[in-house]
Amino acid sequence: YGLELSDRHILITGGSQALYLYAANAFGGYTTSGELKQVVLPLCPDYTGYGGVSLTPEALLAYKPTLEIDEVRHRFKYRPDFSQLEINQQTGCVIFSRPCNPTGNVISDEEVTKIAHLAASYDVPVLVDSAYAPPFPALNFTEMTPQFGENIIHCMSLSKAGLPGERIGIAIGDPQLIGILESFQTNACIHSSRYGQAIAAKAISSGKLADLALNVIRPHYRRKIKVLANTLDAAMPDIPWYLHQGEGAIFAWLWLKDLPMTDWEFYQELKQVGVIVVPGSTFFFVFREDWQHKQQCLRISLTATETEIAEAMKRLAQVAQQVYQSVVLSQH
């Protein structure tokens, strides 16, 4: 990536989740003068793990996205709404996942640059959660370039690249910002475990980890998102359903517009036919605005086999048909 890095640019933590805890409380929360510095999520829904990172819950602030909808293909995509997004002197830091858990969304290179530029005006660090990004685990199905910059802290994890139990998080950024996070970690646990790092160092230096990511992990999940999408295209009834563009990560995100019940109620209906999903409202944890869309989405894991995914989507389509049809019948 053309970077000139020293050990002062890098921090190893006990998993990337720890990075967001350090950042949210080092850069966000109340200052000594009593001013509240906000932890901004520029696009919601996003990773639920951010919901508990701040010891000052009121510091978290999330923004509603814009929706690009393809009515014909039954697809849609979230984008940051720059007409609403505010980063100012009250902002402590910005955090977002790329690719995104839960939606599989990839904020574009240009959008990342724009967010970083807005934040740079106020010396605000931007943490890009790259747990699913290249170079490993490389769980992106669309072109994306890891972004670096003076105020960008690039946060990586090896959990999805085959080392979940070792809890290895990697932060790459400006030495001044890395130093702040390092001081926070020193108070918390001195340093992260060395044993997992030794395993990772061997896998990285040999080139095997990058090869595994590109030639095994990425194709494995890319096939599954295709199976899921193709099955929904064939099986879904004539209702306003939209699948988020499958751009990365290990989840699919389904929006059932005008769903006649809540996402939690639909989740219970799916359980009755042996299909387990996660109600989407879980991922709008900070977003307090009343928005019906929040109760109309589902996160679907891609960890099952291709056969199981196809069968589950057929069952989901049948349940959706029954639920929407029951409303039509009740209106007559």
Task: Describe the residue ranges of each PLM region.
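Short, conserved charged micro-motifs
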Residues: P260-F266, T307-E311
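Conserved core of the PLP fold type I
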Residues: Y1-Y122, L127, A133-F148, I153, ...
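Conserved core segment of the aminotransferase class I/II
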Residues: L11, L36, L55, P65-E71, ...
